[in-house]
Swiss-Prot record:
It is found in: Plastid, Chloroplast thylakoid membrane. InterPro entries: YidC/ALB3/OXA1/COX18, YidC/Oxa/ALB_C, YidC_ALB_C. Residues 118-166, 247-275 are lumenal. Belongs to the OXA1/ALB3/YidC (TC 2.A.9.2) family. Residues 334-350, 386-400 have a biased composition (Basic and acidic residues). The gene is ALB3.2. Signal peptide: none annotated. This is Inner membrane ALBINO3-like protein 2, chloroplastic. Residues 86-96, 188-225, 297-422 are stromal. Residues 358-367 have a biased composition (Acidic residues). It is a multi-pass membrane protein. One of its GO terms (molecular function) is membrane insertase activity. It comes from Chlamydomonas reinhardtii. Residues 1-10 have a biased composition (Polar residues). Residues 368-380 have a biased composition (Low complexity).
Amino acid sequence: MALQMKQSPSMGVRRASQPVLPPRPIVHRGVGSVSRRPAVVVKASLLDAASAASAVDAVHHATQLYTLAEGGPIDVLAQFFEFVLQTLDEGLESAKIPYSYGFAIIALTVLVKVATFPLTQKQVESTLSLQALQPRVKELQAKYADDPENLQLETARLYKEAGVNPLAGCFPTLATIPVFIGLYNALSNAAKEGLLTEGFFWIPSLGGPTTIGGGLEWLVPFENGAPPVGWANAAAYLVMPVLLVASQYASQKIISSQNNQDPSQQQAQAILKFLPLMIGWFSLNVPSGLTLYWFVNNLLSTGQQLYLKATVKVNIPEAIKAPATAGSSTPIVKPKEERVKKVTGKELGSRKKRRNDDGEEVEDVEVEVVSSGSSSSSGSNGASGRKGEKFRALKAREAAAKAASTVSAGAGGSEEGKDNSA
């Protein structure tokens, strides 16, 4: 009976936490009967039920995520690209063109580059405008080297006057990311559905050598001294990744050759130096149809960059684009020490000579000055010198008059004493 009381609460908890499982019926034993079921078995059954419930919850959660992703915008875009690929493939097949699906991938890549050409043009215009303003930016950096706050304000004012938005080049790149993801999903779905089974020139199959998530199982480990797909197929599949890495390096070299003087561009080039190797490694883990798309897209992007940099004109006034010089209308602020002219002893001597013997001022002599700032300072120094001379002459006259009055007073007193004595 004690065992029955111990089982009832445990089964009650199980019913509360796991409603999907039916409750175990309680078996009433007769008087004198003893339950032989150990407690460990009861705990094991509870753990099995909990594990089963966790697995059910995990499957349900994964199903919900799959349902949400299936109707998302990226999935809709991927389905649209799949439809375009299928339409192009059928059209090329009806025209009796061999390797129809490979040429359909190339045609889709060209259509996408044409559709995103305005965004690419906007990006190149923004990049060229920023490059044209680099001399002024460097001038501001040298001028406000110890004042980052004013440097930021003056740089923002410069961009505003030139009508340039530094972030404008990022928006076209961000806008093309969903397109790339949609194309990637479309080609991945085509490979999973077996639509990329045909080859393309030397490539045995556009769906090979691996599937999504298959990794490098087609290349390693070796079996009987050869890759799993054989040496001939492995060499054929490796040609496209090698071409992709080479084209990526050539594209970086061509595009970055015009920006070697920009330190920020040099730093970015050093960081992106290993990007082609990463892309090449990734191309070994996906179907060859995706590698073909990346290769063609890379060639078209390089051609677009060269064409736009040769044809796009930057509309920035020369007064804003060129650095400030001595002959320009932009004033150059000089240090205070250069603006104030020091008065020399020779100039003070010439000012003293401009007075006659009676201390009266004579006609002023014209003094040559170097700059307007120095003339104003020397004029003020001359005025203060003349005021000092007048003050000293006045004091000398007062002292002479006082001495004369003292002497005359003493002489008058001595004569009065003589008269009294007489």
